[in-house]
């Protein structure tokens, strides 16, 4: 530590015990000074909010509390000491909740996700009860999808009815799900909540015949021609689907890719499509690829765009269109020669897919970007949904950007989010301790959250993909994540196996996995 001016100093690791104001602060890296009001500031003039001493001690010991529900943690992110893993909140909540309650969410074709749980049902714990049910229902909606909520609790019915009304706290979720499922959103009070009903489909792993696999990304499109399990041709073409408002551009790009692959096969027996977005019965219900297409054209020209492109080009051949996250999970299952795989891609957002114990694709939404992971009152807000504490702000480039200033990394505001991520990655490549703190914090987030995802999915393997997981930062995230699982969740040892993709996974590839989706007739 060396003085630069009065009350100014430079540090590598800073951990203040107590100053004259009776305040405590966390660990940071870089140059600091104390201003006239006794506040700790970065060298660029940015303030750090100092916590009162008693409150800071509580965080150092990992005691988390909200709405009268508390939990003790061994592992706390060094750059986000308020982080309260939602799984630990739920566990502590249920330890004292005794009143039975059921909730269910219905989606397309009569499929239902039902949870039998408990609340306190006392006046003093009503806020905690409402918060728990709010987070549970939101998790069910974004994990499995739905347009109708059922509950057998009159009090929780009134709360959910208010939240999921126009202008209510969950108006975004209500409107989104109503559009995806093409059905008005409803909350129903009943004394007979429907039980869970699923219909996972055996997709993928079909390598016989002449197949085409198409992978539609936001910046490039990939296509493969596969003959009896062997890739005989593949190409990758840059395109700009997110900035084009004319759906003819998308249609022509898809058809061009299909024809390019078909030219290298004697015939076409089946076509599989992997595409970012939400797909129900092969139809596009919501996808950022068509972000600029006017709403009035979406229904007529986008919802069936893949179906039209395939049938217009090849006639009546088997086809399958699913979310790219599910295809990633399928590629992981094929490379591992195992099942029960949750794939998580940490890039622009948090994308996910799941292959169950029987190797089947579930048809769930798996939109983990909007599933709550943090119960802290001050959790970061997602600009799109307006909610706080959801996965997108922890397991995407947004998570890195959020933590960087707390580590003393100053990112130019003019940079795009992808460029800001790259800047932190470059620091990590040079062993910058500030960047390491960012990745360690994400590793702690991930360890706690994977344990929670395990309670939702029962997954055995977790495949970690995307730009955030690339390079040395990804290795550090994985190492810290495994340590958190070992220390906080020893019961999951051997039952939950997070990993980065290996060469075998890369050989399978997204487009080849997509080609394996449909069975031949």
Model-derived regions: residue spans:
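Short, positively charged and aromatic/hydrophobic N-terminal segments
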Residues: 17, 23-27, 31-35, 39-43, ...
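N-terminal accessory interaction module
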Residues: 62-199
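Glycine/GP-enriched mid-protein hinge/lid loop-to-helix segment characteristic of carbohydrate kinases
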Residues: 42, 54-115, 128, 197-203, ...
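Glycine-rich phosphate-binding loop and adjoining helix at the ATP-binding site
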Residues: 121-134, 138-144, 155, 159-191, ...
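Internal alpha/beta domain cores that form substrate/cofactor-binding pockets in large enzymes
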Residues: 437-457, 470-521
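Adenine-nucleotide phosphate-binding core of ATP-dependent small-molecule kinases
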Residues: 114-140, 243-256, 260-266, 402-461, ...
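Short glycine-aspartate micro-motif
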Residues: 148-150, 209-215, 268-272, 341-345, ...
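Short glycine-rich phosphate-binding loop at a beta-alpha junction
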Residues: 143-153, 267-276, 457-468
């Amino acid at each position: 530590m060396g003085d630069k001016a009065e009350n100014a100093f430079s540090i590598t690791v800073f951990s203040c015990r107590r100053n004259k104001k009776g305040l405590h602060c966390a660990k940071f890296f870089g140059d600091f000074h104390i201003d006239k009001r006794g506040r700790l500031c970065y060298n660029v003039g940015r303030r750090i909010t100092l916590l009162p001493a008693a409150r800071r001690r509580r965080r150092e010991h990992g005691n988390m509390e909200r709405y009268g529900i508390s939990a003790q943690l061994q592992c706390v992110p060094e750059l986000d000491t308020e982080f309260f893993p939602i799984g630990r909140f739920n566990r502590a909540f249920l330890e004292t909740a005794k009143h039975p309650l059921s909730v269910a969410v219905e989606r397309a074709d009569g499929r239902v996700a039902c949870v039998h749980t408990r609340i306190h049902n006392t006046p003093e714990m009503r806020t905690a009860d409402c918060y728990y049910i709010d987070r549970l229902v939101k998790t069910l909606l974004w994990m499995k999808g739905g347009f109708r909520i059922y509950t057998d609790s009159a009090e929780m019915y009134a709360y959910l009815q208010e939240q999921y009304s126009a202008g209510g706290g969950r108006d975004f979720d209500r409107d989104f799900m109503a559009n995806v499922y093409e059905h008005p959103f409803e909350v129903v009070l009943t004394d007979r909540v429907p039980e869970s009903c699923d219909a996972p489909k055996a997709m993928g792993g079909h390598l016989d015949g002449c197949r085409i696999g198409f992978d539609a990304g936001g910046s490039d499109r990939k296509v493969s021609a596969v003959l009896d399990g062997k890739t005989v041709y593949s190409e990758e073409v840059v395109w700009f689907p997110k900035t084009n408002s004319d759906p003819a551009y998308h249609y022509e790009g898809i058809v061009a890719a299909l024809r390019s692959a078909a030219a290298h096969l004697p015939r076409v027996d089946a076509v599989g499509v992997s595409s970012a977005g939400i797909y129900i019965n092969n139809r596009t219900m919501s996808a950022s690829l068509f972000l600029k297409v006017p709403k009035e054209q979406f229904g007529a020209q986008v919802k069936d765009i893949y179906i039209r492109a395939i049938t217009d080009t090849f006639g009546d051949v088997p086809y399958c269109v699913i979310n790219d996250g599910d295809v990633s999970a399928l590629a992981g299952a094929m490379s591992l020669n195992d099942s029960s795989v949750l794939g998580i891609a940490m890039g622009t957002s948090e994308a996910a897919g799941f292959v169950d114990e029987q190797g089947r694709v579930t048809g769930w939404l798996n939109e983990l970007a909007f599933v709550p992971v943090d119960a802290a009152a001050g959790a970061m807000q997602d600009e799109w949904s307006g909610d706080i504490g959801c996965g997108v702000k922890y397991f995407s480039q947004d998570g890195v950007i959020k933590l960087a200033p707390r580590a003393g990394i100053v990112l130019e505001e003019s940079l795009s989010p992808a460029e800001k991520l790259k800047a932190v990655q470059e620091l990590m490549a040079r062993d910058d301790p500030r960047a390491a703190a960012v990745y360690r914090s994400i590793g702690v987030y991930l360890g706690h959250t994977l344990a929670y995802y395990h309670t939702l999915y029962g997954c055995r393997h977790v495949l970690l993909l995307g730009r955030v997981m690339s390079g040395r930062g990804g290795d550090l995230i994985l190492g810290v994540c495994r340590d958190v699982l070992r220390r906080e969740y020893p019961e999951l040892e051997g039952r939950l196996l997070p990993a980065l993709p290996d060469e075998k996974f890369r050989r399978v590839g997204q487009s080849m996995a997509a080609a394996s989706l449909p069975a031949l007739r």
